[in-house]
Amino acid sequence: MAEYRFLDDARWRGLCFFGCRIPGEKMVFGSCPSRDCIEGIADGFVIKPFDPQARVITIPFGEAEGKETYHEENTDFPYYPTAKAFYMKHAGIIIDYLRENPEKKVVYSRVLTCETRKSLTDIFETLCRTYPMAYVFCFRTPQTGLWIGASPELLGEFSKQSFKTVALAGTMLAARGGKWSDKNKREQKIVADYIRNILSTAEAKHIYEKDGEKIAGPVKHLITEFSATLPDDVKAETIIEQLSPTPALSGYPQYEAIEMIVEHEAYRRGCYGGFCGIHNHPVYGKSCLWVNLRSMRINASNQCAIYSGGGLMPDSEAEEEWLETERKATTLLSVL
């Protein structure tokens, strides 16, 4: 646990910082830089909020050297949980819209709130131990506030022209056997087709796909793993920005789905549904960016806002979608 204690130290000193554990790895990467965050994708820990218009920021690699900054954090914190009546009403409106537009999809989310007495060190260590195949991350900047999570969804792993990503969608209880529903299959197909189109448009070569399932805490998802070789004149960072947010986090068509999300969710998502991860790490040797998912934001009073969502389709039922968000939220609730 000692290797994680820098998280609490940096938090209470008011520093920008990050910590992350790559799935299947024992090493934890972390940094409390003496420099402020950098705008754009640079060498360091990259953070992109959900809003496509929001700017990417990077926490550079490095150590703090004793500097204390006490930055003022972004105060857009959702203090109140999404009421079930509100969720049911607005999910119902979206589902009715989708029944008239069956080729579309909207990812609708809600917030659960609680307080915790646990330290970041305790939460991070428990997430690493409980979810060994998740991407466990924690970061804080004045622009974003403090976030921590255990994501099951890779957005992009790349080194030079080698590129990997996944389509992850569809949800059912991990303990449940049987076949996947048509709704789940169609939901996942929308995401996979979206990724195929981006790779095809970029004229990527040697595209390989592998279908399967991925367990993430109490639930499991359909997954298609993609690997490809990008042309010499195509940057992996460009593909990342085209992918995010994928239909797994926004819906389809992307901008129309985002308009529905803004209209019907009672808060701003902030970093939930965006991405974060290490870029050009000198030891790891490659870049590894993950979707900010199964995550929560923590304010200075240790109030937690847990974000949980699911894909709405024409044949969705609002009550079942509500229960799905409950199951997904247990990833974090179980460690608090």
Description of each model-found segment:
Residues 46, 106, 136-139, 270-277:
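A short glycine-rich, hydrophobically flanked beta-strand micro-motif that places a catalytic Asp/Glu
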